[in-house]
Amino acid sequence: MILQHILILSSFLFCLGIFGLITSQNMVKILICLELIFNAVNLNLVIFCKFFDSSAIIGNLFGLFIIAIAAAEAAIALAILLAMYRNRRSIRIDRFNILK
C-alpha cells in the first residue's frame, strides 16, 4: 500500500515539474522544475530498489549519483544564467537570442 502512495507522490511531482517546465518563462523557475523532475525520478528509483530487492544497495548508490549530477548541473546552469543576466539584465527565456 505504501508503494502506491509513494508512486502517486512521485508522479505528481513529475507532472508538476513538467507543467512548470512548459509554462514558465523565468530561467530560475525552469531550473527548479528540472530539479523537481530529477527528484521524482530519484524517488522512484530508490523506492523500487527498496521494495523489490531490499538487500541491494545499488538503487541508493544510483540515487546518490543522480543527486551529485543534478547538483553539478544546477551549479553550471546558475553560472551560465548569471553571465547571461550580466549581459542582458533579464532572466526571461524569450529574451535570450544570443545563440542565434
Curated annotation (Swiss-Prot):
Q: Which GO biological process entries does UniProt record here?
A: ATP synthesis coupled electron transport; photosynthesis, light reaction
* TM stretches of this protein: 2-22, 28-48, 61-81
Membrane topology annotation: Multi-pass membrane protein
Which UniProt keyword terms apply here? Chloroplast, Membrane, NAD, NADP, Plastid, Plastoquinone, Quinone, Thylakoid, Translocase, Transmembrane, Transmembrane helix, Transport
**One GO location term (cellular component):** NADH dehydrogenase complex
Q: Keyword check for NAD, yes or no.
A: yes
Which reaction(s) are listed as its catalytic activity? a plastoquinone + NADH + (n+1) H(+)(in) = a plastoquinol + NAD(+) + n H(+)(out); a plastoquinone + NADPH + (n+1) H(+)(in) = a plastoquinol + NADP(+) + n H(+)(out)
**Subcellular location per the Swiss-Prot or TrEMBL entry:** Plastid, Chloroplast thylakoid membrane
- The protein's Enzyme Commission number: 7.1.1.-
Recall the GO molecular function terms of this protein's record.
Answer: oxidoreductase activity, acting on NAD(P)H, quinone or similar compound as acceptor; quinone binding
> Principal place where this protein is found?
plastid
Against Pfam families, the record matches this protein to: Oxidored_q2
- What InterPro entries does its record include? NADH_UbQ_OxRdtase_chain4L/K, NUOK/Mnh_C1-like
The record lists its disulfide bonds as: none
Please tell me whether the keyword Disulfide bond is annotated for this protein: no
- The domain of life for this entry's organism is Eukaryota
Tell me, how does this one assemble?
NDH is composed of at least 16 different subunits, 5 of which are encoded in the nucleus.
Which family does the entry's similarity section mention?
Answer: Belongs to the complex I subunit 4L family.
Q: Which HAMAP family match?
A: NDH1_NuoK
The record's NCBIfam families line, in alphabetical order, gives: PRK05715.1-2 (NF004320)
Q: What does this protein do?
A: NDH shuttles electrons from NAD(P)H:plastoquinone, via FMN and iron-sulfur (Fe-S) centers, to quinones in the photosynthetic chain and possibly in a chloroplast respiratory chain. The immediate electron acceptor for the enzyme in this species is believed to be plastoquinone. Couples the redox reaction to proton translocation, and thus conserves the redox energy in a proton gradient.
Q: What protein name is recorded for this chain?
A: NAD(P)H-quinone oxidoreductase subunit 4L, chloroplastic
- The record lists the organism as Chara vulgaris
User: Which gene carries the instructions for this protein?
Assistant: ndhE
